[in-house]
């Protein structure tokens, strides 16, 4: 977040914004850039999709116990390098798999559920009844909830096996997963680089095929940016599409439970299970839930121009200053590919776009300062003794909370203080209204909007940890979507130079509220025709 005076200037100086400006998109080439090829041996480690797992169980080729053993074996081989998980529930996963096999034998596969035998990683800010839930913070070290988050419960009811809790930046506040109170997760494409954040553990776990799919949360890009960095599919649903019950609150008006998969099909399958109204969350929507997977068209049934008649706007402000040249090239080549599939692609200007970042950090920090006041060392988590209650509170929070969390609490408290509320918080809310209006107008003209998911590919561990402004600038592509409450899908679209096999780049697709089905359909067509999902990180060939 910019310093207070700089943020104030940005927020006070905005003027009435015109409707989005459009100009014809010009591609940099006629063909999408060729992804960097990983070694052929990686094919032997190709991940099992949800569909292939189900087919294996149905045919009797493999049991749930055998599938679980295979994933746990890969997890044990790769975890020392990747460090995706804070807690691995291997014994519990093996027991659940054996119980699934017994149920399949007696009741049949359909009775067990559509996710039978599918191993899921769960971001550690989602509550799980049978394993620790820390939020990535030492202040909750050892805390074990008495209940499952609604999204977790729905996965279990569908037959999924939770293999463990994935690492994250503390309470979701960060973009690299370096801010975890427990360990630093690495990127499976290059273990000297960050996986993104805050859901870096969930993204790296799917990328390294330590689990089939995973859950994350997205407050300002925490699913989409790590999906781009790790070369997997990441979905941020519409605000209210998935229940937040059991999610440790960071910024309640922005937080969304999302998911990762190695393909759009797997991601769509997970969304169908976790989406829907929940009486335990007053902000959850009663909007109808589709069978998102059934709406996807396989490659052999696609028309020659499957996106014919579709209008796509590429956000002009996301292709300028501060965005790496290789990322811009990959996104423009992806847009060119969308044109080849029959769509009309034009650049569109969203004049409020640059105001979103400072507004986001004011609003998110303000909400965090309230939400995190519950962690006081009394009811659960780390406690530091003191001579009186104030010393106990202060000592517990000072020792249990990390630097980034404390900094955002201070910023939020400052923005909400009596003398500065109108100058910061109220003005940020006004900017949020402008952002919503800007997206609404653009999406009345276009079926979807596209942009990079991040201004760069994965960077070196430690490169930005001491430069908060550079770190926050990495959220430029994603925070506006949270401010507007819109759904967004990230699909791998190419590679830039770096590491031994290149570094992935993700294309962000943004839609109108509750248009997840359309995003997944377009993303599936794009993915199949590029087939990026078949490329896996070098780590798997080496493990």
Swiss-Prot record:
Subcellular location: Mitochondrion; Plastid, Chloroplast stroma
Keyword Transmembrane set for record: no
Quaternary structure and partners: Subunit of the heterotrimeric GatCAB amidotransferase (AdT) complex, composed of A, B and C subunits.
Job of this protein: Allows the formation of correctly charged Gln-tRNA(Gln) through the transamidation of misacylated Glu-tRNA(Gln) in chloroplasts and mitochondria. The reaction takes place in the presence of glutamine and ATP through an activated gamma-phospho-Glu-tRNA(Gln).
Record PROSITE patterns: AMIDASES
HAMAP family on file: GatA
Full protein name: Glutamyl-tRNA(Gln) amidotransferase subunit A, chloroplastic/mitochondrial
EC class of the enzyme, as a word: ligase
Listed EC numbers: 6.3.5.7
Naturally occurring in which organism (per UniProt): Oryza sativa subsp. indica (Rice)
Assigned protein family: Belongs to the amidase family. GatA subfamily.
Any one GO biological process: mitochondrial translation
This protein's GO CC annotations: chloroplast stroma; glutamyl-tRNA(Gln) amidotransferase complex; mitochondrion
Any one GO MF annotation of this record: glutaminyl-tRNA synthase (glutamine-hydrolyzing) activity
């Amino acid at each position: 977040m910019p310093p207070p005076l700089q943020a104030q200037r940005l927020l006070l100086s905005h003027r009435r914004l015109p409707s989005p400006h459009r100009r014809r998109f010009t591609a940099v080439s006629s063909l999408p850039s060729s992804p960097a090829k990983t070694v052929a041996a990686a094919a032997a480690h190709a991940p099992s999709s949800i569909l292939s797992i189900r087919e294996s169980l149905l045919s009797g080729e493999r049991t749930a116990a055998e599938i679980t053993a295979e994933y746990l074996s890969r997890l044990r081989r790769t975890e020392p390098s990747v460090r995706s998980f804070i807690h691995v529930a291997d014994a519990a996963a093996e027991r659940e798999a054996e119980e699934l096999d017994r149920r399949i034998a007696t009741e049949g596969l359909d009775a067990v559920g559509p996710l039978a035998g599918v191993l899921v990683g769960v971001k550690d800010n989602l509550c799980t009844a049978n394993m620790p839930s820390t939020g990535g913070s030492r202040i909750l070290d050892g805390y074990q909830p008495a209940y499952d988050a609604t999204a977790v419960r729905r996965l279990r009811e569908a037959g999924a096996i939770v293999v463990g809790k994935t690492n994250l930046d503390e309470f979701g506040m960060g973009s690299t997963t370096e801010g975890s109170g427990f360990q630093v997760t690495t990127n499976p494409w290059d273990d000297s680089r960050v996986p993104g954040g805050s859901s870096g553990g969930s993204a790296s776990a799917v990328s390294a095929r330590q689990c089939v799919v995973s859950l994350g949360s997205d407050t300002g890009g925490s699913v989409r940016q790590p999906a781009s960095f790790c070369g997997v599919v990441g979905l941020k649903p519409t605000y209210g599409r998935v229940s937040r019950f059991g999610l440790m609150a960071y910024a309640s008006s922005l937080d969304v439970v999302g998911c990762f998969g190695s393909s759009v099909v797997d991601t769509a399958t997970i969304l169908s299970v976790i989406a829907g109204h929940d009486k335990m969350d007053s902000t959850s929507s009663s909007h109808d839930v589709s069978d998102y997977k059934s709406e996807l068209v396989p490659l052999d049934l696609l028309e020659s121009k499957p996106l014919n008649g579709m209008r796509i706007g590429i956000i002009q402000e996301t292709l300028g200053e501060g965005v790496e040249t290789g990322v811009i090239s990959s996104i423009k080549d992806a847009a060119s590919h969308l044109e080849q599939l029959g769509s009309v692609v034009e650049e569109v200007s969203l004049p409020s776009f640059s105001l979103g970042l400072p507004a986001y950090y004011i609003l998110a920090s303000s909400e965090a300062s309230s939400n995190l006041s519950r962690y006081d060392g009394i009811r659960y988590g780390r406690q530091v003794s003191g001579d009186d209650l104030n010393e106990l509170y202060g000592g517990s929070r000072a020792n249990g909370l990390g630097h980034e969390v404390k900094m955002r609490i201070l910023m939020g408290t400052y923005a909400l203080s009596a003398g500065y509320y109108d100058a910061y918080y109220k003005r940020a809310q006004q900017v949020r209204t402008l952002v919503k209006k800007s997206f609404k107008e653009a999406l009345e003209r276009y079926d979807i909007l596209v942009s990079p998911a991040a201004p760069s590919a994965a960077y070196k561990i430690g490169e930005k940890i001491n430069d908060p402004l550079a770190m926050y600038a990495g959220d430029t592509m994603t925070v506006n979507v949270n401010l507007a409450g819109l759904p967004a899908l990230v699909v791998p679209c190419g590679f830039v130079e770096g590491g031994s096999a290149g570094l992935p780049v993700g294309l962000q697709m943004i839609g109108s509220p509750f248009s997840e089905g359309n995003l997944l359909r377009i993303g599936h067509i794009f993915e199949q025709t590029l087939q990026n999902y078949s490329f896996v990180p070098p780590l798997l060939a080496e493990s």
